Amino acid sequence: MEQLVYIALLGALGCLCRYFLSGLVYQVFGTSFPYGTLAVNLIGAFLIGLVMEFSVRSAAIPPTLRFAITIGFLGGLTTFSTFSFETFRLLEDGALLIAFVNVLVSVVACLTCTWIGIMVARAL
């Protein structure tokens, strides 16, 4: 039960971070492209690579904390559903190129960020 509380608390924190970070990114870059969603997903992809690799190589992050961070915080921070919805809206609006770029950049950049997180964890 304690584990669920940690996941819920960090999940709520992740959701709040997503709300404020994506909002800030949209204020800076505008809404012509899903920049805010991309930004939080890139951050989350980097962090999951870092946390998971570091926790595999070290006992510094106990499983309870690892689950709270990855399932809770990063689950709240990142959003595949919003990515899907925004991409669908772009397709629906006829912005096929922007939708394609969103999918391509999101997948390639998130995988790259995860890899960078893993490499950083290995260097620590």
Swiss-Prot record:
Q: Which GO terms describe its cellular component?
A: plasma membrane
Query: Topologically, how does it sit relative to the membrane?
Result: Multi-pass membrane protein
> Which segments does the entry list as coiled coil?
none
- GO molecular function per UniProt: fluoride channel activity; metal ion binding
- What are the transmembrane regions? 5-25, 32-52, 67-87, 96-116
What the entry lists under InterPro entries is as follows: FluC
Report the subcellular localization: Cell inner membrane
What does it catalyze? fluoride(in) = fluoride(out)
Query: Which keywords has UniProt assigned to this entry?
Result: Cell inner membrane, Cell membrane, Ion channel, Ion transport, Membrane, Metal-binding, Sodium, Transmembrane, Transmembrane helix, Transport
Domain of life here?
Bacteria
Q: Is Transport included in the keywords of this UniProt record? A: yes
Activity regulation details: Na(+) is not transported, but it plays an essential structural role and its presence is essential for fluoride channel function.
UniProt binding sites for Na(+):
G75, T78
Q: One GO BP annotation here?
A: cellular detoxification of fluoride
Membership in a protein family: Belongs to the fluoride channel Fluc/FEX (TC 1.A.43) family.
**What is the role of this chain?**
Fluoride-specific ion channel. Important for reducing fluoride concentration in the cell, thus reducing its toxicity.
This protein's name: Fluoride-specific ion channel FluC
Q: Which organism is it from?
A: Geobacter sp. (strain M21)
Q: Which gene encodes it?
A: fluC
